[in-house]
């Protein structure tokens, strides 16, 4: 059996830098490695409707936005198969059959589902489709016989549930489905990029994103407004690097060439961190450096998207 990748995104808005470091960079690397026989990248419009059923136009419009973001980041249609979920109706049929193999209590225990229900303030008014979307994801993965699924850290519970469905199905109907392996981002700083407000996760619904298509001035405004160490009130105060969103972003995006170009007084990023920790380095200077880094990373993506 060949090596097959299945991955994708919900078209509920433009993609942001959390998607970029969390999955898109990894997809491009895997695509260009030549190690896989097939790569399928799904624009999950049917899944997007599970919490946007009253806003179908939003989903419809963002299908193209997501496709443009893919191409701008380096997804190559000659190497990767980009498709729209709703155009493969068999996925919905397979989801229905899998629903008979999963209990309500098991879905309720899924940490990702619980977190997203809380984030959307659904409480008791959870749409059934949204509640069951881990089952839909399992159908997507197994329908294409995916052997590998690149995911962010927050999606690990979904993949575990998929594996449970595979085991259950195979125990009842015989060895039919393929259990997928998981690939996490190789850069550990990218496992979960926080929002610019310091919240645990960057999210379109929370409005705390830097989008891949943001203009230069929008990026600057967002970076300069970023949450940082609340106890670092004066330049001379020692600052906290661990858990500080500005430094998390630098860990995810900064390259040595950016330090050499934008901060020639420092040998490397670690030296900048040590200066911040002992005091004498203001947040504004660090944010200006981060802005330069983000501009250098995102300008080529933005220009490719426009072309």
Please identify what each model-predicted range represents.
Residues 157, 163-307:
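Conserved nucleotide- and phosphate/pyrophosphate-binding catalytic cores
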Residues 70, 98, 154, 199, ...:
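Divalent metal-coordination and catalytic microenvironments
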Residues 23-30, 162-165, 249:
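Buried hydrophobic packing segments
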Residues 111-115, 119-173, 194:
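Internal, conserved structured core segments that host functional sites
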Residues 37-40, 45, 142, 148-149, ...:
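Glycine-rich phosphate/pyrophosphate-binding loops
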Residues 21, 57-60, 152, 156-160, ...:
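Short, conserved loop/turn and helix-capping segments at secondary-structure boundaries
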Residues 2-139, 296-306:
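N-terminal Rossmann-like or analogous alpha/beta NTP/dinucleotide-binding catalytic cores
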